[in-house]
A protein has these predicted regions:
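Repeat-unit-sized solenoid/scaffold elements
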Residues: 1, 9, 55, 59, ...
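Small-residue-rich hydrophobic transmembrane alpha-helices
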Residues: 1-59, 65, 102-116, 120-121
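Residue-level detector of solvent-exposed, low-hydrophobicity positions
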Residues: 8, 23, 137, 150-151
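Short runs within selected transmembrane alpha-helices of multi-pass transporters and secretion channels
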Residues: 16-19, 94-114, 120-132, 136, ...
């Protein structure tokens, strides 16, 4: 996880940049008295940009996994055999979930908080971890003894519930 955690942090830099920009743009327009419809339109535009950035980052990571990570990065950490396959599997799951992560970061830390809806941002952040990710991960790993890919997907499952709830809000 230490390696994938660093790759994740590096990969989400652009997402947090868009999120910060979204907070400034949305907060400024609200402060200027923009209509609710205009704020929604701006928010959707920013969310689509963040989704696009998530897809671009996913594509870049998908290209880096077989060309840089597996042959050069992972051996620096003496990963081979099973540990190499687990690290690669974790990276693949992260690549698949990256667009939802980008969307969620912008929606929660950018748009909802800038709009003053910190309660919903808190519920989405904390609730999705403790009511979705932790139980799914515990069940897949401890009860069902599922493969690593499914356990990793359980860890990332919070994104699957944040997107529809965030859009609804």
């Amino acid at each position: 996880y230490a390696i994938m955690g660093n790759i994740e942090k590096f990969s989400t830099v652009a997402c947090y940049g868009i999120s910060g920009a979204a907070a400034v743009i949305v907060g400024k327009r609200i402060g200027e008295g923009a209509s609710k419809e205009e704020i929604y339109d701006i928010s959707w535009c920013l969310l689509l940009v963040s989704l696009l950035i998530g897809v671009i980052v996913s594509a870049a990571l998908a290209a880096l996994l077989p060309t840089i990570f597996i042959p050069y990065l992972y051996p620096l950490f003496h990963l081979e055999g099973l540990s190499l396959r687990i690290a690669a599997t974790m990276c693949v799951v992260f690549i698949i979930m990256m667009p939802t992560k980008a969307f969620d970061i912008t929606n929660i830390t950018g748009i909802l908080r800038a709009g003053g809806d910190v309660r919903m941002a808190f519920v989405l952040d904390v609730g999705s971890v403790w009511l979705v990710s932790v139980p799914i991960t515990a069940l897949t790993a401890l009860v069902f003894d599922a493969p690593v890919a499914l356990v990793c997907l359980g860890i990332q499952a919070e994104g699957l519930c944040k997107v529809p709830l965030g859009v609804w809000r």
